[in-house]
Amino acid sequence: MDTMGRHIITELWECNPDKLNDIDYIERLFVDAALRSGAEVREVAFHKFAPHGVSGVVIISESHLTIHSFPEHGYASVDVFTCGDRIDPATASQYIAEGLDAKVREDVKLERGMGPIRVPEAQVAISK
C-alpha cells in the first residue's frame, strides 16, 4: 500500500470520570497532545452533553484527533489520524491515555492510503 497516513484507534477504559466529563480539561488535553506530537492546530470544536459526556475534534494540518467520552462508564473512544510521516500519532495517543488516567488501553494501528486496509490485531496495555 502507498501509505498516506497513520490512524490509531484507541479504546480507553477505567478512566477518571471527572476528567472525562470536563470539557475544558479535555479540550486542553487534546490541543496539548496535538502540539506535543508536532502537529499544527487549525480548528478546535468540543461539545458537552447533558447529563454527561464530551465529544470533540482538533483539526490539525496533518488531519485530526477526536474523542467521545462516556464518564458514566469510565470509557473514551479516541482517534488520532495523521497524514504523512512527520507526526507520530502514537505520541498524541499515549499523552491522551495518560491524561485521562486510563488503566486499560487498546490500540488498533492502521496505515491509510492507496490500497486495501490491513487490520492488525489490537494491542492491549493494562496499567493497573
Curated annotation (Swiss-Prot):
GO terms for cellular component: cytosol. The lineage of its organism: Bacteria, Bacillati, Bacillota, Bacilli, Bacillales. GO terms for molecular function: adenosylmethionine decarboxylase activity. This is S-adenosylmethionine decarboxylase proenzyme. The keyword Lyase applies. Pathway: Amine and polyamine biosynthesis; S-adenosylmethioninamine biosynthesis; S-adenosylmethioninamine from S-adenosyl-L-methionine: step 1/1. Pfam families: AdoMet_dc (PF02675). Keywords: Autocatalytic cleavage, Decarboxylase, Lyase, Polyamine biosynthesis, Pyruvate, S-adenosyl-L-methionine, Schiff base, Spermidine biosynthesis, Zymogen. The modification Pyruvic acid (Ser) is found at residue 63.
